[in-house]
Amino acid sequence: MNRGIARVLPLAAILVLAACSGGSINPSLNPQNSSANEQSAVAPPDALTGPASREAPFVGANPVRRLCPTSVDPQLMECLAMVRTDVAPTLSAGADLADPAKTCIFTNAYCPVDLQSAYALPSLSKGAGRLVAIVDAWGYHHAASDLAYYRKAMGLKACGTGTKCLRIVNQNGNPSPLPRESGPSDDWKGEQSLDLDMVSAICPNCKILLVQTDNNYTSSLYAGVKTAGRLGAKYVGASWGGPESGGDNSIFHQRGVVIVAAAGDNGGGGHYGGPQEPCSYTYVVCAGGTRLVPAHNARGWSESVWNDLTFDRCGFGGSSPCGATGSGCSRKIVKPSWQHDTLCHMRSESDVSATASLRNPVAVYNSEEPGGGCPTSCWFGFGGTSASTQIISGVYALAGNAATQAGAQNIWRNHTGHMSDVTVGNNIDPGVGVTCASTIHYICYARIGFDGPTGWGSPKGLGAF
C-alpha cells in the first residue's frame, strides 16, 4: 500500500509513482465514488463537496482500527486514537514544489497549516519556550526520529533531543531506563506519534516533554501526570481514559498547570455507560471531537459532531471499529461552580472540541505503525479524541495563561466571540447499538451554545484560553 511520502525516496519520485498509479490507492478514495449510505452522513450545510471536501471515504470492511482495545479491567486505561487501515494520505499535485508551512501536501488528510487556519491560531508567532507534556504508556523507540521527519515534511522548525526541544523520560522523570514497547494488541506507539505530531502542528515553537509510563495501568499514567507537572510542564495532554471510579483526584489539580483529557471515542453511551475519567474531573479540560470540513463561509471551515458510527461498514455496538466523540453527565463528580448548564446537576462533559473524525483525518508519520510498509511509506490518517486533546493542549500553550486557569472555567466564562459553535449532529446511533446514556437531550445532541459532544465549540483564536 502506498502511504504517501517515502522515508528514503525524494518527494518528487513519490509523486511520479503516485501519478503512475492514478494518484490514489483505490478509486473509491475519490469522494464522488463513495456509497449513498456514506453520503448521508450529517455534515454542516455549507460543507464543500467532491474533491474539495478533503474527505477520505471509508473503503471496504473495517476501514478503521482502534489502537487500544477496551479493557474489562477498571484499573487499565484505554488510549483513544484510531487509524485508517483502508486508505492513506495521498500527495497533492505539485507537493514537491509547495511550501508545506503554507499549503498542505496531502489531498485527504490535514496538515498543520489546515489546523492553524481552521482554528485561527498564531502558531508561528506564539508559544516560544513553553513546555507541553504528553503522558502516554509504554515505549516508542522511534519517537524522536519520527517526529523529526514529520516536522521537516510539514515545514516546521526542528525539535529534537539534541537541542533540548524534545525530552523523553520515564514515569519517574528519568531519561533511562525507558519502558519497553507495548504488545501488538495495544498500539501506544501510534498514540504517541499522533500526540507528538498534533502538539507540533499547533505549537511548533513549544518544547515537548514526552513522559512514557511503565504500562497503561491507572496508577502508572497518573504518576506520569504528576511527574509532568513536577518537571515544569504547564500544559499536559492525557489522550486516554477509563470508567469513572470515584471523585476527583488531586494529581489533576496542580496549581498553574492546565491538563486536557480526551472525552472518549465511544459515543454518548460510551463503553462505560457515561463519561470517563480523567476527562470528567473538575480541574481537567475535557476535549470532545468534531468533523472538520472545508466550507463556503467566511471562516473557510465548518464543523459537526464527530460521529463515524453511522456507516454500515463499521460493525455493531462495542465491537465497532469506528467511533464517535464521548459526552456525558457525571455520576461521580460534583458540578463545578463555573459550569452553568441547567439540566445536568453533576459535571458535564465535554468543555471544548476539535477535529477527530476519521473521514477527514489528520496526517501522522509513524515508522513503527503496523501495515504501513515502512521504511518506504509511513504516513497514516489518524483521528479520535486523542487528536482533539493534543490540539487543545497546544492551543492553551499558545495562549500561555496557565497561571490563571482552573480547569475549563475560562472557556465557560469567555466563550462568547472566541469559539466556533458546533450546532449540527449527535454522537449516537441506535442502529449500531449506541444510545445516549443520559436522558438530557443536549448531552448527546449538538445545539446552539453548550452541548455535551462539543462543549462550547472549537477554538476561534486564543481569547477563550
Regions found by a protein language model. Name each.
Residues S21-S24:
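Bacterial signal peptide processing site
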Residues M1-L9:
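Bacterial N-terminal signal peptides that target proteins for export
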Residues A298-G318:
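Short, surface-exposed polybasic-and-hydrophobic patches located at secondary-structure transitions
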Residues P27-G289, R313, G317-G383, T389, ...:
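Substrate-binding/charge-relay-adjacent region of secreted/lumenal peptidase catalytic domains
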Residues T218, V293-W301:
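Short acidic, Gly/Pro-enriched loop/turn segments at secondary-structure junctions
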Residues V395:
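Walker A/P-loop NTP-binding active-site region of P-loop NTPases
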Residues V16-A19:
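C-terminal motif of bacterial Sec signal peptides marking the signal peptidase cleavage site
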Residues S388, T404-I443:
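Aromatic sugar-binding interfaces of carbohydrate-active proteins
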